[in-house]
Amino acid sequence: MCIRDSNGINGTQALKEVSATKVSSKDFCHYDPALNDKIGLFGQAGSAQSELKNNGVGIGDLFLFFGWFKKTENPKIDIHKIFGWLQIEEILEGDKQIANFLKKHKLSHPHDPKYRKYKNNTIYVSRKNFGLFKKFSKKLVLSAPNHKKSMWQFPKKYFASAAKKKSNIFLNRLKWKDNRKLLVDTNIGPGQEFIFDAQEVPDISLWAKSLTEE
């Protein structure tokens, strides 16, 4: 992790405020997804990649990336929030494909086999429309108010009808905790690949579009 000043905030101090006391200036982060370069890239491997592949994730599908965010001035406030997106243009499978692509486009990525060997190594390459949400918006917050951060609440406009009909929204591990309040508990063991079926429920695509076009 490269710890530098950002917008007047010292990186080392910010990490200490969120209890990341074991991080030093000599540590490096696994920068993935990489959404700041000319081509967006997202690496997966092992069982996580198998889960995506087995559920039919492919060309044209959209990743919405979420993370854990804290307000450093008040550590008691923490949320899950969407921070970026990537629509799949190409899927690179295996070390040879990945290495050749990165070399051709003069890109660096932690899934480059010269850095580390991964089982089932895969990189998802973006279409031109990808990026980071650089401004805070309540629309990007997943955590439900007055709940732990892992309890998500989805917007009524896009999810209420499908939840009421008990449509098959979730393709893998998620399920409704309370379909009337549109609550889903994501604290269900290891893994963070949550796959939604936008073919079954087209309103999911409209929700994603409302975020990425904001």
Task: Describe every region a protein language model picked out.
Residues 177, 184-214:
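Extended repeat-based interaction scaffolds and adjacent low-complexity, acidic/S/T/P-biased segments
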Residues 77-186:
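Aromatic- and Lys/Arg-enriched surface recognition patch
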Residues 17, 51, 89-93, 193, ...:
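Glutamate identity and glutamate-enriched acidic tracts
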Residues 1-3:
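Short, small-residue-biased leader/transition segments that mark boundaries at the very start
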Residues 9-79:
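Short N-terminal edge-element motif at the start of the domain
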